[in-house]
Design a protein with these regions (language model features):
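Conserved alpha/beta enzyme-core scaffold
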Residues: 1-431
Length: 431
């Protein structure tokens, strides 16, 4: 395969093109930096940026490039949050699993895809490694594919491969992948994790996210048997369960025996575990996040988080008031699929307060807050004070259950709000 420089490769990008940039822990940094260097000669290039982690700043968002690059974020992450807050870009609200369809049906047309892949195997196939998610559909739809071929990228199977013949240009690098440190659960998070673990049966299929609470849940599952993993994001937290055989995927209906994910957010240990592993597949996020595929697995345990929850069970997970801080991701997809799964359960797991001491359970969502998961599919809300069981309960009963797991300092205030809203039907319920 012929390699070129990043500066030469991005000359394939022209004014008025639309460009997809691969995200998660797999940003093709050399290509993105080289594209930004061309800012002075490019005009009206539409950039679709995906979820991203790490310290890499998004240079194309800078004010001096406001006429060069028109930024549409598919998931607001740290690298572009401040630029979007200042008006140098916008976000497209969409379920993560829906975005591939937006590429495929031309709603979001793509001229160029900038991707980060492994070196080719003996048959000429490179792997997306840690990030299949949106990259699979992006390279399917883009007219021009420019690849950063990274020696540090693990080779994963599933949908995550592309033949070198499809690459318009390739740049060879040996650049460490972004690593996401394992979050050590706090005492509060360990309590929440233990409550959830008690409700997970043997033979369950897990969908679990990133952070202290998910890690606390996983750490509490060592005594379980025959768990499965069908998730959007895979982290280091699953490794002990995979290596000990607690997760053996034997009871899954969809790809039994296989660990299924769409992206990986972890350490080098996780990436090395993935390398050429035949019992692990990285899939198009439209496939992993399809609620009607998710529901086919037995006992799906969908475990997600929130910015805030109101007294009826509505969940805001992507904004603080009007300020967008992340994206919908796959929360709705897995909460829906989990609710439909035979024996499935859905959880919203949150500490009762923010680091500033503000309650995360509120009478009403903050003005401007978006509802990511509706009250109709939230079955359990878990804090360090216990589990609010919401499934099948009326609104007044939900309010009483949620107040019981709110921080004690706000319960009286929430009781007054609930009494004013629901009247006698709330007051008759015992605290």
């Amino acid at each position: 395969m012929h390699y070129t420089t990043a500066a030469e490769a991005v000359k394939l990008i022209r004014s008025n093109d639309s460009v997809y940039i691969q995200g998660s822990t797999s940003i093709p940094e050399a290509l993105v930096a080289a594209m930004a260097e061309r800012g002075g000669e490019l005009e009206h290039v539409t950039v679709y940026s995906a979820f991203a982690v790490g310290a890499f700043d998004a240079p194309y968002c800078r004010p001096e490039y406001k006429e060069s690059f028109l930024v549409n974020s598919l998931f607001v992450a740290n690298n572009i949050r401040r630029w979007l807050a200042d008006g140098y870009g916008q976000t497209i609200p969409a379920f993560l699993g829906e975005i591939p369809a937006l590429f495929r049906d031309g709603t979001l047309p793509l001229d160029v895809a900038l991707i980060n892949v492994s070196p080719p195997d003996a048959e000429g196939y490179c792997s997306f490694g840690v990030s299949a998610d949106l990259a699979v559909s992006a390279v399917e739809c883009a007219k021009t594919i420019i690849a950063q071929v990274n020696r540090a990228m693990p080779y994963s199977y599933g949908d995550a491969v592309i033949h070198v013949s499809r690459l318009a240009a390739a740049v060879e690098v040996d650049s460490p992948l972004v690593e996401v440190p394992t979050a050590v659960p706090s005492e509060t998070e360990r309590k929440i994790g233990s409550y959830i673990a008690e409700l997970i049966p043997d033979g369950a299929t897990l969908q679990i996210g990133v952070g202290g609470i998910p890690n606390a849940v996983l750490a509490a599952l060592g005594g379980h048997r025959h768990l499965g993993l069908h998730t959007e994001a895979m982290t280091d937290g699953v490794l002990p369960l995979l290596e000990s055989g607690v997760i053996d995927n034997s009871q899954k209906a969809v790809m039994p025996g296989m660990t299924v994910a769409s992206l990986a957010l972890g350490s080098r240990r996780l990436y090395d575990y993935m390398d050429y592993r035949k019992d692990l597949v990285m899939k198009d996020v439209a496939w992993t996040n399809d609620p009607f595929r998710i529901r086919q697995n037995p006992k799906v345990m969908a475990i997600n988080s929130a910015v805030e929850v109101d007294l009826t069970g509505q969940v805001c997970a992507d904004s603080v008031g009007m300020r967008i801080i992340s994206g919908v991701g796959g929360q709705h997809d897995f909460m829906y699929g989990g609710a439909l799964s035979e024996g499935g359960k859905t959880f919203i797991a949150i500490p009762s307060t923010t680091p500033k001491g503000e309650s995360k359970i509120r009478a009403l969502l903050s003005p401007g807050a978006g509802v990511v998961t509706t009250r109709h599919m939230v079955q359990h809300v878990v804090t360090e004070y216990g589990v609010a069981h919401l499934r099948g309960r009326n609104l007044a009963e939900r309010a009483r259950a949620l107040i019981a797991v709110a921080h004690p300092s706000v319960r009286e205030e929430l009781e007054r709000a609930a009494a004013g809203r629901f009247g006698y039907s709330f007051l008759r319920l015992k605290a």
